[in-house]
């Protein structure tokens, strides 16, 4: 045990431990930085103090906690995300957002794919959600890909510590440059791609002949629709479901109208949910949760009888759900509570279910089911505010009363200003300085 190792030998002992992890099997091969402690030149005595403090932690404090190491690992990932820049923080998706996506697509069995898996957080939080719903995470086969080397290693360690079997490919590389799961299609997809990614269209994309699901090549200026079409191509044709986040601009970009029209007319888009601002640590923008579904024909699904809802899209606007600010964080942030996640999912499930009339399914300022004809008249825009009714509260304003009160307040301010002007002039005059 490290606690018994003298300070003078501790650096070597820790590096030996890293080497042992490297040699333990293929799961963590290439994940650890060998000779790390030697290279960073930490003072042996200081390192010994840290080891001694860690050894004071008693597992008894955590009771039956089975995932202590995993929780500690996640804590440090989150701490780094809090202090990271926008680009650095892309590897981490807050747990409440993952829970929302999982609640909508219910990845309880089969295969789960994330084409930009970051540190593996989607998989971890999804596993927790499945277990909380009395599901068996061993029935879910995880597939992912990540282009950043350090983040790829974080993901492998993160999943290994949780005992989650995974397939992340042979190494880090962009999904667009090389699909390491070519030929495979999946039951579920969850993803949080980098928002508005530029410079994604490389010569490798052209040479690989990426499958855009027969929708044509997406704009090179922005990867949003490249992600959409890639994920659509990776869904099982008869039942695949995807839930992913994109910047709000993807809802109505002029240069993607043709692709968006085809997605809508082919009945691939099931729901569009605009989320509150400040859900992320590294950006305060509002983003959208997209739900794609290869089967809107109805039937039994996870114990629910679904109606045929082809020709409809459910729009939801959750931007006002900001009543839960996270206290104690260095950056302003809000989160979605479990009851809010459930409420949003219930709205979605009711809309899908037998007995619901999609033509009238609506609640002002929150959600509305919309048919293709109305989408067509709006040039296939997917911006929820185009369709959800918002109450014009200005109609209830007594403008005469408001303006009268405003005029009275301005008069008082002007009168007070005159009084202050006289007082200031008199004060200066008494000092021998007179204002002209």
Which positions does each model-derived feature cover?
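Conserved S-adenosyl-L-methionine
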Residues: 87-191, 196-214, 226, 246-249, ...
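Generic marker of residues within folded, mature protein domains
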Residues: 62, 132-134, 280, 305
